[in-house]
Amino acid sequence: MKDNTCTKRDFLNGTKIGGDEPFFLISGPCVMENRDLLDRVCAEMIEVCGELKIPYIFKSSFDKANRSSVNSYRGPGLAEGIKNLEYIKNKYNVPVLTDIHETSQISPLKDVIDVYQIPAFLCRQTDLISQSAQTGKWVNVKKGQFLAPADTRHIAVKMNESGNNKLLVTERGTSFGYGNLIFDGRAIPIIHGFDIPLVFDATHSAQLPGAAGNSTGGQREFIPSILRSAVSFGIEGIFMEVHPDPPNALSDATTQYPLSQIKSLLKEMIGLDRYIKKEILISRSSL
């Protein structure tokens, strides 16, 4: 276990993560509903992150392959998703991330995205991890709700044996009986013990899986409190899905965070992050 951040290292676009470096942000709408939504969210997030000096990665999904109901909206599909990601990347000059579900999706995305994301339910899929790693790009693996924090070391080994150590692990809550998740903060120092950069997913950690019958429910009101707790452990990145009108979003309507409120929440996290890394963790490591 390591009660500190991970070792400092180079990241995207000349930025660094780890040590006392400030957090970066992965954020965007849960799913690609339409081009106008992607434009609006990315433009506003770039403005917010530029003002707050937060390194920003745009995120959105072309296919939500694990929806609870077969009738739920999944997204535009891979071909249209690639066009959308190319459009956002070229227009805003921003790194982009999307999730993949099959190894066949890796190659078509290679020249477009900067970070591959492995969904939580697929976090043990060796071929998906290894072949993503072989591209040489960063790979963000969502830690499954069922996975012990110590078992993330196996993910790191799969990455390293593929010749790539550009791994991020995202903590997104742990199953707590049926239809509920909790955030177990012990996961952060445990994962840091393997020197893996840790991202905290504040929006999915507030989910109530299957609680809405045909879809996943959630408790958006707890997101700020959960995020404060995670930041106080010292983390490298924050993951948050945002939407201008969450109740009418086509996916994760109960947990996407209101776009209009993201700036004030991030400002609060900047102060807490700076205090923890400069005054607590780094000073403690020198004792």
Swiss-Prot record:
Which superkingdom, per the lineage?
Bacteria
Q: For this protein, what reaction is catalysed?
A: D-arabinose 5-phosphate + phosphoenolpyruvate + H2O = 3-deoxy-alpha-D-manno-2-octulosonate-8-phosphate + phosphate
What keywords sit in the KW lines?
A: Cytoplasm, Lipopolysaccharide biosynthesis, Transferase
Tell me one GO molecular function of this protein.
Answer: 3-deoxy-8-phosphooctulonate synthase activity
The EC number(s) given in the record are 2.5.1.55
Residue ranges of coiled coil: none
Give me any GO biological process, just one. Answer: keto-3-deoxy-D-manno-octulosonic acid biosynthetic process
Family membership, please give it. Belongs to the KdsA family.
* HAMAP family assigned to the protein according to its UniProt record, in alphabetical order: KDO8P_synth
Listed name of the protein = 2-dehydro-3-deoxyphosphooctonate aldolase
In which organism is this protein found?
Leptospira interrogans serogroup Icterohaemorrhagiae serovar Lai (strain 56601)
